[in-house]
Amino acid sequence: MDRLKEIAKNLDSKDELSIYRDKFVLPKNQIYLDGNSLGVLAKDVVDNVNYTIKEEWGNNLISSWNKSWIQLPRIISRKIADIIKSNEDEVYVGSSTSINLFKLLKSILEANRDIKNITTDSLNFPSDKYICEVIAKDFKIDFKFLDYGNDLKPDIEKLKEYISERKGIVVLSHVSFKSSFRYSVEDISKFCKDNNIIVIWDLSHSVGAIDIDMRSNG
């Protein structure tokens, strides 16, 4: 055990990301690995939130809308576009992932009444699955759930065969929240395009963590 600790300490000392540790509030003697549900608090956030509450809200009141707040969606959209390598006008900032997925599915189905089903798989995030089910029920179309029989990795060929037989909308998470399995956006998006299938990617567990190029892969 002592040898393993020494190996771990040695690897930590060479880790290029170790310089970022001091930028976060970390409880003493705790190893925290949950970054997708609630990540650790960045120290800068405390100062920024305090400034927003005390200065922008407390002192500037309604004038803060014109000074900075009203432009925030565009500013943040521009930053996200840089991270995922997409055009700025393709990024929308507002509401939660679930609400946005609901609105997106509803808009697609209202514009394409010939779509008869929505498909997702067992590696997708539960709330995405619930949204797909509800929308399918509202539009009186079929909800299809592909279960791989494990929580680790999908059977890509099985997925392709499944959605090609049930052409409609498929909703997938780019990175699985349980196993961190990473789907090939390029491969599956091309397959869907070639087979006249609409694919929606949830990037919640990948954006900012891994390199994403939606301009090339979309």
Named regions from a protein language model:
Residues 1-218:
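Pyridoxal 5′-phosphate
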